[in-house]
Design a protein with these regions (language model features):
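Bacterial N-terminal signal peptides that target proteins for export
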Residues: 1-9
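C-terminal motif of bacterial Sec signal peptides marking the signal peptidase cleavage site
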Residues: 16-17
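Short, conserved catalytic or interaction motifs in soluble domains
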Residues: 20
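Noncatalytic scaffold domains of N-terminal-nucleophile
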Residues: 23-68, 72, 80-81, 85-257
């Protein structure tokens, strides 16, 4: 049986978050939305890719370490969903600007044997107390992009932990806890900061300086992490270990508290 799947993952983190545009009255004049000159993430280089075919399985992701995590799972006899879970969790560590357990996702799953396509909507949702004025300033004007995104204001209710748990129950082969061995080890022992992650840190120095926790992690000694630096994240390992041991339930309790 062969499977293929596509993911569109969004992390509600300091470096990248999903922010909803403020609602405006129908009869009001359009209000320009300030983006604080926030440009899309810059590329770190172009590489010509050649077509590659595989007889049995293949793993691909936005980071080599995450790809290795997926490949190792497939090599052990895991399903495509097993590999996805290992890769997505690893991406939360190695590319925090774009992925994370605190975000949401769409998942498109193709069962080649049954010739059936199944889609999952696990996008993060706004908190219960959110109102249309959430991203308006004290004057009722739309907040600047970075002021709206950075910090807890833009955080939604995460969907990824529950998604991973649910699709594993449906399509997983390997034991749930075993899928998190790689990201836990990388977080505890250290992983190499990629050029892409380093570039994202350089582009977001001011927002990262606003909070002691982000400054300490991404800007040790006041300087941005350089590509090639070995970085450890024991707090991430602790969260993933909770996910491995207790499923998505802690993300509605222990972790979020």
């Amino acid at each position: 049986m062969k499977f293929s799947f596509g993911l569109n993952l969004s992390a509600v983190l300091v470096l990248a978050a999903c922010a909803h545009q403020p609602m405006q009255k129908p009869d009001a004049a359009p209000v320009p939305t300030a983006v604080d000159n926030h440009a899309p993430e810059q590329g770190t280089g172009l590489t010509e890719q050649k077509l590659i075919r595989a007889k049995h399985y293949m793993a691909a992701s936005a980071n080599p370490l995450a790809t290795e995590a997926g490949y190792e799972v497939l090599k052990r006899g895991g399903s495509a969903i097993d590999a996805m879970i290992a890769m997505q969790t690893t991406l939360g560590l190695t590319e925090p600007q774009s992925s994370g357990l605190g975000g949401g996702a769409f998942l498109v799953y193709w069962d080649n044997k049954a010739k059936k396509l199944t889609t999952f909507d696990a996008r993060e949702t706004a908190p219960k107390a959110a109102t249309p004025a959430l991203f308006l300033d004290e004057n009722g004007k739309p907040m600047g992009f970075m002021n709206a995104v950075v910090g807890g204001r833009s955080v939604g209710v995460p969907g990824i932990p529950k998604l991973l748990e649910d699709v594993h129950k449906r399509y997983g082969k390997l034991p749930w806890a075993s899928l998190f061995d790689k990201p836990i080890a990388l977080a505890e022992q250290g992983f190499t900061v990629s050029p892409r992650m380093a570039k994202s840190i350089e582009q977001n120095l001011e927002p990262l300086k606003r909070y002691p926790q982000t400054a300490a992690y991404f800007l040790p000694d006041g300087k941005p992490l350089a590509a090639g630096t070995v970085l450890k994240n024991p707090e991430f390992a602790r969260s993933v270990r909770l996910l491995a041991e207790k499923g998505s339930a802690p993300f509605c309790g222990a972790v979020e508290e």
